[in-house]
Every structure is written in C-alpha cells, then in structure tokens.
Swiss-Prot record:
GO (cellular component) term, any one: cytosol
GO MF term list: argininosuccinate lyase activity
Organism classification: Bacteria, Bacillati, Bacillota, Bacilli, Lactobacillales
GO BP of this protein: arginine biosynthetic process via ornithine; L-arginine biosynthetic process
Protein name (record): Argininosuccinate lyase
SUPFAM superfamilies noted in UniProt: L-aspartase-like
Chain's gene name: argH
Main location class: cytoplasm
Length: 464
C-alpha cells in the first residue's frame, strides 16, 4: 500500500519510486529521531498550554510521542522510505498509534523549523561530548608531561635537530592546541544553543504560540529573534565543521609525530599492541594504523566543511532542498571526531616512552650549537659574531666527524679566550634545557609553571 504524502493535496500524480528514493533522507536523518520527538514533545506541550489545541488532545499526543521515544530507544521503530524523512516517519507512526488527532501536532509548525530544531538539539549533545572528551585528552597529556619533565628530546625545525627540549614541553604544546579547540567548541555552543522552533516555514505563524516556552522546555538559551534566519541558518554547523577541521588537524599533527617516533629510525616510543596492527606478509611488522587512520580521516572532515560551504554559498533565503545536504557531513564529522579523540587518548595513555633513546639522540648532533653562541654572547661578544664563530666550528666538526662537546679546551681557548672550562656543562643537553626558563620556555621551572596552569584549567573544566 502506498504511503499517503502529508503534502499530497496539491498533486495529481505520485513520484516515481526511483525519484522518491533520490529525494528521501530517512536513510541518514533517522539519526535525528530522538531529537525530533523531543522537539515535538515541547511543541505539543506549548500547543496545549496556549489552548491552540485542547489539553486533552495535547495529552493524547504527548503520551503517543513518549511511547515512540521508548520504542526508539529500545530499537523497535521501523522507518519507511516512502515517508521521505524522519519528521514524516514520526508523524506517520504517531498516527498509527493514536489516530487522526496526531495531525494536530503539526499546527503552527513546518518541517523547516522542525529540522533546524532537530539539528540544534543534535549538535548541542555532540558539542558537550566533544568538550568532555577533549578534557580527558588534555588530562592524559598533562599526566604524561608530568612524568617527563626531565626527559630530554630533540626539538625540530625543518625536521632537523634544532635545540634540545623537554618532552613535557612538546606534549604541553599539544595540550595548548586542544585547549584552544575546547574554547572554540564552547563558543560554538553559543550559536547552537538557540531555538528555531516556532519560526514555521519562514514567516512565523498567526497562532498565539509561545516560543520562549518551547525554547525553555528544550533547554535552549533563547529563541531565534528572526524567523527567516531561524530556518535558513546553518552557521552553527559550519562553525562545528570548521572547529572539527582544526581539531582533526591538531590530532593529525600529533599522530604524524607518533608515527615517526615509533619508526625504527627514531625508536622514541612504542605503541601498545591494542593500538597497532601487523602485516599479512611481513611477520616483523607492527604498524601504527590507528594513528595513520586519524591522519587520513582529517581530509574527510575537511571535505565535509568545504562541501557545506559550497552548498551554502549561493542559497537565497530561506529554505531550499539543498539544505538536505547539511546532515550527512555533520553526522560523519561528529562520529569521526568523537572516535578519533578516544583513539588518540588511548594511544597516548598506553604507549611506552623510551627516555634513554630520546636523550641519546641529542648527544650526537649539533643541537647544542645555540648554547655555545649564547655562552659567548653572555660573555659580551655580539651575538652575530658569536653565531659566525660557532657556525664555522660546526662546519669543521662535521668534516672531522665529531661534535662540539668533543672539542678540546685548548681549541676552545684558541677560538676565544672568553670560553672557560664551564663550557662543557653549558653544552650538556639537560643543562641547556634546564636553563631556558623564560616564560613558556622549555626549562624545568617554566614547565612546572605550565603544568600548574594546565592542571588548574582542567580542574575548572571538570567543575563546569
């Protein structure tokens, strides 16, 4: 039996089946079922309170919706593609349950404000989850940094050894990135926590609705102040996709480093077996597949952002069917981000850090060259002159196959009488790191200050 279209009064002919399938969205927008029912519950309570429909009718509709919500949460609802989308599927199921009175639910409402409301509710839930998971990830980074304040590793520029740094500082750099991500998602909430319900198709309604009431019932901060904006706004989704893209970029950067660190050439870390895979042909392989997948999925999230920006770029006010394309990218991004945060957190929490290997990699390089230049500058030599002297010495050492700490004291004295026997302490990677205590620097005192601030920030985040 063909499902009757709720909008069918205007039409003499029905859609062909293949056209209907092209236009239907129930395949993916069924993810909004819970939120669609929640929005309808708020709407029908308001309709009853304002006497737009009778209290008795409102109670019957409310009871039917509550039954549908229970059935949905139990996985018992079955949706029909002939009902196009989640809104018409829910209304059809409600009609089967309580009869024609279900038709009064849509009084003073359009699918335009209905779908916008559903997406605001969905994204609110998602934002809370993302921020909560980011707080956990930041906590793991802080805990790991606390363990490795005095773990020395090479700091890189251009992927070349630059200066020795504390591994804790490297981790805290990512902590800061994820903190900014949390702030962006929190700000995103301001534009998401607004109710479109009651805007109707675009121009509002002649019924004496109470939009503040429905907004409050759904837990929104306020209703939209302009009905045209309410049904056509997708900025809140674009902000989410943009913020998610930046977050994925940060996670991808860290994953790239983890991939390098667990390679044979680095051997800085070993990933847990629970976050690694093997090879079907090479029995020795232990591959960082999960880190690689996060890196790969980053491009997918970027694509979702560009996709929706492109959909929106020429849309006139207000609702256009193009906006059906706003959902799949949002759902995909939300699911990708949430699982990626969990995977990265798990990798960091279970990986083994090889402190000795990290430290050794700073001993057979020239990353202490800046220390020698700074040493000479601290003795009164102009830094540019010191830079020139050290550069030439590095060249000579490179040709001779040894390092700055191998140069004899006599040779140093010949280079400059300003150089004293304490030069060898200054060239030590650990000493070099410990002394850089400028604000935000890699020195141990500076790291302690950074950790203190980070712990306070996390405590505040957990108390919200």
């Amino acid at each position: 039996m063909e499902a009757k279209k709720l909008w069918g009064g205007r039409f003499e002919a029905s859609l062909e089946e293949w056209v209907e399938e092209f236009g239907a969205s129930i395949r993916f927008d069924q993810k909004l079922a819970k939120y669609d029912i929640q929005g309808s519950l708020a709407h029908v309570k308001m309709l009853g309170q304002t006497r737009i429909i009778s209290q008795a009718e409102a109670q019957v509709i409310q009871a039917g919706l509550e039954e549908l919500l229970e059935e949905y949460e139990a996985g018992k609802l079955v949706f029909d593609i002939r009902n196009e989308d989640i809104h018409m599927n829910i209304e059809s199921l409600l009609t089967e349950k309580i009869g024609s009175v279900a038709g009064k639910l849509h009084t003073a409402r359009s699918r335009n404000d209905q779908v916008a409301t559903d997406m605001h509710l969905y994204l609110k839930d998602t934002l809370f989850q993302v921020v909560d998971k980011l707080t956990n990830l930041r906590q793991i980074l802080v805990d790991l940094a606390q363990e490795h304040v005095e773990t020395i590793m090479p700091g890189y520029t251009h992927l070349q050894h630059a200066q020795p740094i504390s591994f804790a500082q490297h981790l805290l750099a990512y902590y800061n990135m994820f903190s900014r991500d949390s702030e962006r998602f929190a700000f995103n909430m301001q534009h998401t926590n607004v109710s479109p319900l009651g805007a109707a198709a675009l121009a509002g309604t002649t019924f004496p609705i109470d939009r503040q009431m429905t907004s409050d019932l759904m837990g929104f901060a306020k209703p939209y102040s302009n009905s045209l904006d309410a049904v056509s706004d997708r900025d809140f989704i674009l902000e989410f996709l943009s913020n998610a893209s930046i977050l994925m970029m940060h996670m991808s950067r860290l994953c790239e480093e983890i991939i390098n660190w667990c390679s044979y050439e680095y051997q800085f870390v070993t990933l847990s077996d629970t976050f690694s895979t093997g090879s079907s042909i090479m029995p020795q392989k232990k591959n960082p597949d999960m880190a690689e997948l996060i890196r790969g999925k980053t491009g997918r999230v970027y694509g979702n952002l560009v996709g929706l920006l492109t959909v929106m770029k020429s849309l006139p006010l207000t609702y256009n069917k193009d906006l059906q394309e706003d959902k799949e990218g949002m759902f995909d991004t939300a699911e990708t981000v949430l699982i990626s945060i969990d995977i990265l957190a798990g990798m960091l929490k279970t990986m083994t850090v090889h402190k000795e290997r990290m430290a050794q990699s700073t001993e057979k390089d020239f990353s202490n060259a800046t220390e020698l230049a700074d040493y000479l500058a601290s003795k009164g030599l102009p830094f540019r002159q010191a830079h020139e002297i050290v550069g030439k010495l590095v060249l000579e050492c490179s040709k001779a196959g040894h390092y700055l700490q191998d140069v004899s004291f006599e040779t140093y004295q010949a280079i400059s009488p300003l150089i004293q026997a304490d030069i060898y302490d200054a060239l030590s990677s650990k000493v070099a790191v410990s002394r850089r205590n400028s604000l935000g620097g890699t020195g141990f005192e500076s790291i302690a200050d950074q950790l203190k601030s980070a712990k306070e920030e996390i405590q505040n985040a957990k108390s919200l």
